[in-house]
Amino acid sequence: MDVILSTRHHSHLDSLLIETQRVLEVVFGHPVAQRPSPANAFPNPLLSPKDRRHAAGLMRINHVGEICAQGLYFGQVAVARKEELRRHLLKAAQEETDHLSWCSDRLHELESRPSLFNPLWYSSSYMLGVFAGLLGDPWSLGFVVETERQVEAHLEKHLQVLPESDARSREILRVMKVEEARHADQADHAGARLLPSPIPGAMAWAARLMKVVAYRI
């Protein structure tokens, strides 16, 4: 069984080793997608150097977004009170792993690399996930809803500003946008609580900072 989808009980040492392996794979490695990339439906376009750099910057931002999603979900999983919620988070995390792999592949095709700050992005998101989980399951789901809604909005913006000929990147983001919206809806239906107004604003501010940095570094 895939490591991140396993729900059987482990010893503390086993759990630590599994978590360490998963973090290393997410932050420094290349997680394997369980589904083929949507980009495969389109040929790799010939982009100008300027367009290639721009597309790479956008895809690096989206790659970081998926790194953050992994951190958030697994931080929440670590302290989830109910097995049903834990399974819900793990299922969403698997789709996010596919997104991460697709973005990584596209970055490679664009002759670029992931953000150098991925360890920071992951660790800060993991701590946010733990914090959200400790508040209780309804609040934890509320963080999922807000995160996915914000991601959905920035994906829509990226779809509008990608180089017109970059159909491969565009199709990846289109599929991701659909699935992020579904994650938000599922969390909402599972009993998410609406976050108080200062929290979404703070999350949006942190996301803007991440985008500025990740576009270049």
From Swiss-Prot:
Pfam families: COQ7. Pathway: Cofactor biosynthesis; ubiquinone biosynthesis. Belongs to the COQ7 family. It is an enzyme of class 1 (oxidoreductase). Keywords: Cell membrane, Iron, Membrane, Metal-binding, Monooxygenase, Oxidoreductase, Ubiquinone biosynthesis. Fe cation 1 binds at E66, E96, H99, E180. Fe cation 2 binds at E96, E148, E180, H183. It comes from Xylella fastidiosa (strain 9a5c). Catalyzes the hydroxylation of 2-nonaprenyl-3-methyl-6-methoxy-1,4-benzoquinol during ubiquinone biosynthesis. PANTHER family: 5-DEMETHOXYUBIQUINONE HYDROXYLASE, MITOCHONDRIAL, COENZYME Q10 BIOSYNTHESIS PROTEIN 7. This is 3-demethoxyubiquinol 3-hydroxylase. Gene3D superfamilies: 1.20.1260.10. CDD domains: DMQH.
